[in-house]
Amino acid sequence: MNANGQQLRLFNTMTREVAEFRPARPGHVGMYSCGPTVYADQHIGNMRTYVFADTLKRALMFKGMTVRHVMNITDVGHLTSDADSGDDKLEVAARREHRSAWEIAADYTADFKTDLGRLRIIEPDVWCKATDHIQHMIDFAAALDDKGWCYQIPAGLYFDASKDDSYGELARLGLAGQREGARVEVVEGKRGGSDFAVWRTSAPGENRQMEWDSPWGRGAPGWHLECSVMSIEYLGRHFDIHTGGVDHIPVHHTNEIAQSQAYLADGRPWVGWWLHGEFINLRGAKISKSTGGGVLVADLIDRGYHPLTYRYLLLQAHYRSQTEFSWDAMSGAKTGLRRLLDRFAAARQDADAAQAKLGQAATRHLAAFDQAICDDLGTPKALAVVAAAARDDSLGDAELTVLAARFDEVLGIGLTDLTPADLDLAPGGAQVSAAEVEAIVIERSKARTQKDFTRSDQLRQRLAELGVIVDDHADGSSSWRWSS
């Protein structure tokens, strides 16, 4: 497990400390990630959470561990308030788009998986949909009810948080703090403000597409139930890591813990480590899908940005730090990633990596990278190490190619296969591909070399008409970029 040098240290939200990570079974990690609610496309704020979880998984594998990764798909149960009021988000989307909730879920799930691929996020070993586990959830809820943890009101079956002495420990709020929180909703008949729905009963005359029979009446599971049920189903009663966004801490993960500990009733922590990724902001405000805002991965592509440029942008900030999104920031990230790819792609062309042995300098770079990653996934420092290696003239091409492969095991930013030209995606509406632009730029460079400046100017004008800006450099080389 420690074959690569440093011990991996991670921040545990439950303890608020960075500590050495040790899975319950040495060398093997059970990891559960809260997946998307598939009522709309996931915006880039959502995708930051999944890039973080992917970086964590890659780091665990980089350290020699075997990871069993499970992710849910919420296709029922998530209300518009995130708590216990409002309509189911899938039902709202179905009315909005005049389609069935099942069609909505299927289409947006497919879109989400496409975006995972675009960002080189490794898919989980197990996908699990809430609607495929309804009976499991009913059985789980019945067990809680039988043990005296729940009470029934017209709105459904509710968990009595006052019976849990450690309720709110993850959020450091407790019952009083939860009652004061903005996201705690009032439902008629609830005994306490922190009580939450385990099963929601459909109201008389309510016309829902997604509802099932249960001992408490026809209805649907509460949002928090699916993650407890499916994580235990696929990872066992106790597992190592649970990930999500910081917005999951005060309600969703707090309630998952309460019902899971009550169900297990064995005095052991349900999950060993809780890790949460921070928000990315747009002009100072959290990017939010529920408020109708947000930029999609497809929007990045339409603007001519390779999705891995966005991944690179995210890795420039620590996962526990908020960061800002802007098109200027994307442009800067593209420049930074292009610089790395320029060096690694050139080395790749001339290298015989199969014969490479790392010398002292290369070994030091790899050790520094390992140290950065082992310090709670310190990707900003890790990227600085990558940049230092790219600038190190003492490294041979083969060494650099081997290092690129090791670095990219964790970073996933295309160091082993992308070229600078690959970053220049044609924006939406472009009349030519990046390859066609590259051919014109090469032709223009030849004209400049031959001092055929008339032809050079004609080609520059042609490129401008195609939405391309050409930059000529002092060393005689040229580069290009889309104008939008």
Language-model region placement:
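Short Gly/Ser/Thr- and Asp/Glu-enriched loop/turn motifs at secondary-structure junctions
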Residues: 123, 153-154, 473-477
